[in-house]
Regions:
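Single conserved hydrophobic/aromatic residue that forms the stacking wall/gate
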Residues: 1-14, 187-197
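Long, hydrophobic, well-ordered secondary-structure blocks that form the structural core
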Residues: 4-38
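Amphipathic alpha-helical hairpins
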Residues: 4-5, 88, 92-106
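A contiguous catalytic/ligand-binding core that recognizes phosphate-bearing ligands
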Residues: 13, 36-51, 189
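Inter-helical turn/loop segments and adjacent helix faces that build the functional surface
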Residues: 42-53, 71-91, 105-127, 148-152
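Alpha-helical bundle segments that constitute or directly flank the non-heme di-iron/ferroxidase center
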Residues: 51-76, 98-102
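Extended, helix-rich structural scaffolds rather than catalytic motifs
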Residues: 112-186, 190, 194-197
Length: 197
């Protein structure tokens, strides 16, 4: 009824808010590629730059986004609750790990002179990359806050999930050759949860 519609609207707003930062680089790339290859406008360097940022976006999508939700789902699974969902999400996480490895490999090849423009673009985009990671971390933390607004659940809380997201972000950005963004100790994060990262 009316209550479920209201809750649905809240979740839709939260999801749409998170989706905007996911899609903006893809949209910019497809627009630039369409302009250059179909309409004959723009320049190839701009297309490559937008491709590079889109690949970084895929890397973040596959390796950092939704990890708050993953952690919650796996916590339920460890408690023998919602085991079917936990199994399905584990398959999704495995698939995302493969995509993460692939995008990391592509980005590292570009950074190592696979394409002279891409190496230059990588250097130019360092600030953008850090901003993209920080934005994703902020959005994941906001999602954790939203999920935990009524209190902690199944041994998880907003702080723990926030630290976990920072831990994963550090791991992912280091794999791309950057310094860690966050200074934190993870004594309170369980080994199974660390392994997910």
């Amino acid at each position: 009824g009316k209550l479920s519609r209201g809750l649905g609207d809240v979740y839709k707003r939260q999801i749409l808010k998170r989706a905007r930062s996911v899609t903006k680089n893809y949209d910019a790339f497809t627009d630039a590629a369409n302009d250059y290859f179909i309409k004959g406008k723009g320049d190839l360097y701009d297309v490559k730059k937008k491709l590079y940022l889109s690949m970084i976006n895929v890397n973040i999508l596959e390796g950092l986004r939704f990890y708050v939700s993953f952690a919650c789902t796996f916590a339920f699974g460890e408690l023998k609750k919602m085991e079917g969902s936990a199994k399905i999400v584990s398959l999704i996480a495995r698939d995302e790990a493969q995509h993460l490895a692939l995008t990391t490999h592509i980005i590292k090849n570009w950074d190592n002179n696979d394409d002279k423009d891409m190496k230059k673009i990588a250097k130019e985009c360092e600030g953008d990359i850090v901003d993209m990671f920080e934005q994703c971390v902020a959005e994941e933390k906001a999602w954790a806050k939203h999920l935990m607004k009524d209190g902690s659940i199944i041994g998880l809380n907003e702080r723990l999930l926030g630290d976990y997201v920072e831990f994963i972000a550090n791991k992912r950005i280091k794999a791309l050759g950057f310094e860690p963004l966050y200074n934190l100790s993870l004594i309170h994060i369980s080994e199974p949860t660390r392994q997910l990262a």
